[in-house]
Amino acid sequence: MIMNIEKFEEKHLDGVEKIEKTCFAHPWSREDLQNQIGLDTSHFLVATVDGNVAGYMGLQIFGGEGYVTNVAVLPEYRKQGIAESLIREQMKNKMSFITLEVRESNLPAISLYTKCGFKNVGIRPNFYSVPTENAIIMTINNEDI
C-alpha cells in the first residue's frame, strides 16, 4: 500500500464526492466541495492509496483557529492509519487550537481524536439530525499539537 497525502484539487473531486455520499447522512454537495478549492481559509487534504482517493479531511482556519469540517475514509481503507495521517498533517498548520464536533455514538472517531490529543470539552445537544444526536466538542490546543 502506497499512501500519499495531497492538497485537495479538482482532480480529486469525484473521489471526495464518493466518500461524502458513502460516509455521511447529509453529504456535502459537489458544488460545496468544489467551492473549497482555492479558498484561503480552506485547508482540505486528500489521502490516496495506490492512486485512489481513500480519505480526506477538511479544515477551516480563521484568525489562527482551526475548525475541522470533515474527516472521512472509505470503509475498505479504514483501520490503516489514513485518518490519523490526515489529522497529523493538518496539525502542521500554525493554529492556536483545532476544534471539531463528533457524534456521541461515533466511538471509533472519538478514540482516534483522543489518540491524536484532542480533549472532550463539551456537548452540543441535538446537533446532528438523521438520526438526532448530541455532538461531543473536542479541542486540541497549540501547546499539545
Indicate residue ranges for each PLM-predicted region:
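Extreme N-terminal starter segment of soluble prokaryotic enzymes
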Residues: 2-5
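Conserved GNAT acetyl-CoA-binding A-motif
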Residues: 93-104
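Acetyl-CoA-dependent GNAT
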Residues: 7-76, 84-93, 141-145
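Residue-level detector of high-confidence beta-strand sites
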Residues: 56, 121-123
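C-terminal "cap" of GNAT-fold acetyltransferases
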Residues: 103-107, 116, 126-145
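Conserved glycine-rich acetyl-CoA-binding loop
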Residues: 70, 74-88, 103-111, 115-116, ...
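Short, P/G- and charge-enriched loop/turn segments at secondary-structure junctions
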Residues: 32, 124-125
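Short aromatic/hydrophobic contact patches that present stacked aromatics
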Residues: 70-72, 99-101, 137-139
